[in-house]
């Protein structure tokens, strides 16, 4: 009798009983995750549509993740744009200065 009780502790309980399989909350959550990933589209992403918008073209050329061209060109364009804006505004203010007969 004592020997039989010692052996019963070595035998694992029924882990895969029907009551434990249907009642596990983790099984439901895992099924939700699997169904979510099954609903996602498969394969490569579709190609971007053609556009004539210069801002979209600039974005696709320099900033889009699939372009693969990391460079300092946008920073250089920003510096040149600020310089050009400053030069044009300075020139216009200088012309207004000559309009009043100064110099």
From Swiss-Prot:
<protein>
    <recommendedName>
        <fullName>ATP synthase subunit f, mitochondrial</fullName>
    </recommendedName>
</protein>
<dbReference type="Pfam" id="PF10791">
    <property type="entry name" value="F1F0-ATPsyn_F"/>
</dbReference>
<keyword id="KW-0813">Transport</keyword>
<feature type="transit peptide" description="Mitochondrion">
    <location>
        <begin position="1"/>
        <end position="6"/>
    </location>
</feature>
<keyword id="KW-0406">Ion transport</keyword>
<keyword id="KW-0999">Mitochondrion inner membrane</keyword>
<keyword id="KW-0375">Hydrogen ion transport</keyword>
<dbReference type="GO" id="GO:0045259">
    <property type="term" value="C:proton-transporting ATP synthase complex"/>
</dbReference>
<keyword id="KW-0066">ATP synthesis</keyword>
<comment type="similarity">
    <text>Belongs to the ATPase F chain family.</text>
</comment>
<comment type="function">
    <text>Mitochondrial membrane ATP synthase (F(1)F(0) ATP synthase or Complex V) produces ATP from ADP in the presence of a proton gradient across the membrane which is generated by electron transport complexes of the respiratory chain. F-type ATP synthases consist of two structural domains, F(1) - containing the extramembraneous catalytic core, and F(0) - containing the membrane proton channel, linked together by a central stalk and a peripheral stalk.</text>
</comment>
<dbReference type="InterPro" id="IPR019727">
    <property type="entry name" value="ATP_synth_F0_fsu_mt_fun"/>
</dbReference>
<keyword id="KW-0809">Transit peptide</keyword>
<dbReference type="GO" id="GO:0016887">
    <property type="term" value="F:ATP hydrolysis activity"/>
</dbReference>
<keyword id="KW-0138">CF(0)</keyword>
<dbReference type="GO" id="GO:0005743">
    <property type="term" value="C:mitochondrial inner membrane"/>
</dbReference>
<comment type="subunit">
    <text>F-type ATP synthases have 2 components, the catalytic core F(1) and the membrane-embedded component F(0), linked together by a central stalk and a peripheral stalk. The central stalk, also called rotor shaft, is often seen as part of F(1). The peripheral stalk is seen as part of F(0). F(0) contains the membrane channel next to the rotor. F-type ATP synthases form dimers but each monomer functions independently in ATP generation.</text>
</comment>
<keyword id="KW-0472">Membrane</keyword>
<dbReference type="GO" id="GO:0046933">
    <property type="term" value="F:proton-transporting ATP synthase activity, rotational mechanism"/>
</dbReference>
<keyword id="KW-0496">Mitochondrion</keyword>
<dbReference type="GO" id="GO:0015986">
    <property type="term" value="P:proton motive force-driven ATP synthesis"/>
</dbReference>
């Amino acid at each position: 009798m004592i020997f039989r009780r010692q052996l019963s502790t070595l035998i694992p309980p029924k882990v895969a009983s029907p009551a434990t399989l249907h009642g596990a909350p983790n099984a439901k959550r895992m099924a939700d995750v699997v169904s979510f990933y099954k609903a996602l589209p498969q394969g490569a992403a579709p190609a971007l549509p053609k556009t004539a918008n210069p801002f979209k073209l600039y974005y696709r050329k320099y900033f889009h993740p699939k372009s693969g061209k990391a460079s300092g060109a946008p920073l250089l364009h920003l510096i040149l744009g600020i310089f050009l804006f400053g030069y044009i505004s300075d020139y216009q203010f200088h012309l207004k200065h000559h309009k009043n007969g100064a110099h």
